Amino acid sequence: MTISADQVNQIAWNHHHDPFQVLGSHQIELSGKTMTVIRAYQPSAEAVSVISPIDRKEYPMQSVHNPHFFECVINTPKLANYQLKIKEGEHERVIHDPYAFRSAKLTEFDLQLFGEGNHHRIYEKLGAHITEVDGIKGVYFAVWAPNARNVSILGNFNYWDGRKHQMRKGHTGVWELFIPDIGPGESYKYEVKNWEGHIYEKSDPYGYQQEVRPKTASIVVDLDSYTWNDQEWMEKRRHTDPLTQPISVYECHFGSWIHASAHEPAKLPNGETEPVVQVSELRPDARFLTYRELADRLVSYVKDLGYTHIEMLPVAEHPFDGSWGYQVTGFFAPTSRYGSAQDFMYFVDKCHENGIGVIVDWVPGHFPKDGHGLAFFDGTHLYEHPDPRKGEHKQWGTLVFDYGRNEVRNFLAANALFWFDKYHIDGVRVDAVASMVYHNYMRPDGEWVANKYGGVEYIEAADFLRQVNHLLFSYYPGVLSIAEESTSWPMVTWPTYVGGLGFNFKWNMGWMHDMLDYFEMDPWFRQFHQNNVTFSIWYHHTENYMLALSHDEVVHCKSSILGKMPGDNWQKFANVRALFAYMFTHPGKKTMFMGMELPQWGEWDVWGDLEWHLLEFDAHQGMKRFFRDLNHLYCSEPALYEQDCNEGGFEWIDCNDNNHSVVSFIRRAKDGKDFVVTVCNFTPQPHSHYRVGVPEPGFYTEIFNSDAGNYGGSNMGNLGGKWTDDWFFHDYQQSLDLCLPPLGVVVFQLDKKKTIAMIQESEDVETVEAKAKNAS
């Protein structure tokens, strides 16, 4: 007997912070000789023996102080890579002893960086990682839980018994253990015991995959097994400036875009079938499409309509479908509702193959209170701020990250980098930035704490966002970082080195509210609210804006875009076309939610499909053609995107004709020479002989008309284009005599070839006439 009963009891009761001090192989001196003692704790074993790796000889182990604590003394100074033969009832199994592997994956440098909040690839150290130690393959586990009394690993490999794989705690609060002979596909959890003896079963905060809800275990995954085919895309992205590129985003919720029959499982490339994931108990016959199915169906659909990017509502793992993904428990795990991590990689790869960028909604502002998640992770407020006035959103029922804690900030910053590193995404949209940067966001007086200067700004959260954006653009130039910021926080898209938050785009919430308020009015009243249309131009160049009509505008009894519009059915469709035509010619990148292209009559239903049956009707088919052509116009005309963020990209022709609810303006490309003229009529009253001044003489081709018959409009227009008249108007020497369709937007472009040809023809005529006159 080489060990005390107290030491054995600490192991048996899960109270030892370093089980390696007791278990595994140890050298001892007996009778002047150096020998090896091997100890094992196997709670379900009847007998255990040691198998020598040298001669495969078995050495029976004896129970010591506890019927399930075994030890064996072997007459050899050192014994490595031994195995344990365990008899459990009628079954026997042979395993490598986890406590024979003492080497750690985390170095002191790793731990120092993590403690400082600066380990940018900590997701490759913490979590579960397939590795090889001393020639034996297995999985290395590491989790940060500094205030826990004990942490163990649970899984099928130990019958979910937390006594069998107790972890070792390091001086920084990171617990670790290498478990040999297991690999990809293993489900696991952490069993965390606090100092009061309460036990919590937790998913891995750094886990790469989780089980399909309602199950909550993490899954061991090898993320390096996928072979990417997007090298050309990634290289091109590095040298691209998003500010000068066309960006038209199709915002999509994968779980409600379209469903498939639950009786027709999806096929994997190897011929096997994907597990069927039902949409809900209320729809037992419907299943979610998989990432691979979406890669084929959604990508081709989006490409056909001409969008440049797909933005996914949060794809990180979340337990509640009704949260739309905004209450995340698995920050490093794409949701298993739609397939595996490799399946999601395939989706991104397929997008890039088709020239489509991928944006992911990222939620660093809060997390849910689900017991298996981050909340109260080690028995204390670890990830959330301990002060509820800072650490809880009561109206949302969620917890707020402690942005002043280095390890928490490191968790989130590394998480943002992770999606770009491992999944090759092209951008993130950061959700609810205002809730992060203000202490008093949605909090009444008395329920928030001022910062150290007495203000409402959450300084640590703002600094965290600056850190994240600085890292993103340092590691991944050419990507997008988009803020959903609904207040007037200054310099959101300004560089961090001048005090900005460092995003490269911000949703223009003011434009969205102004335009929806305007279009919901009866057209007769719009003449009194011209400011709704024009106000955004006063500030459009102060930030890099993205115009967004998102999912938030078509839920919670707000009605669909089509349902918001006044008038009869024809006017409703015409209003939708006018709204989006103005949006796509207004400065700013574009985002619109799925279903608006149909458009739907009903609100978005997270458990339903889009109203695809509407495409059986001509009016809805016309709208789909409208959006295809609108995207083509936007992406093919540099004047509509190159100077979105510069004052020089926009000029009013006339913004004061409120009596007719008409506005006209010029959009210019970076060279200043390429331009388009847009005229918007926001009433059902058409106007003939409506005069608009233009900067250059010549023939102006009508390159887009939202009232085209092909879109379901009245087909009123300008017969392909107009020649200018020498009529001074709107401070220009020449002008156009136009026909403005009802609730219509028309876009014109100077046809330089036709204009030059006409000038040359005129000059030739004048030359001939002059020669004839001279001859006479």
Curated annotation (Swiss-Prot):
GO terms for cellular component: cytosol. It catalyses: Transfers a segment of a (1->4)-alpha-D-glucan chain to a primary hydroxy group in a similar glucan chain. GO terms for biological process: glycogen biosynthetic process. Keywords: Carbohydrate metabolism, Glycogen biosynthesis, Glycogen metabolism, Glycosyltransferase, Transferase. It is an enzyme of class 2 (transferase). The keyword Repeat does not apply. Pathway: Glycan biosynthesis; glycogen biosynthesis. Belongs to the glycosyl hydrolase 13 family. GlgB subfamily. This is 1,4-alpha-glucan branching enzyme GlgB. It comes from Trichodesmium erythraeum (strain IMS101). The lineage of its organism: Bacteria, Bacillati, Cyanobacteriota, Cyanophyceae, Oscillatoriophycideae.
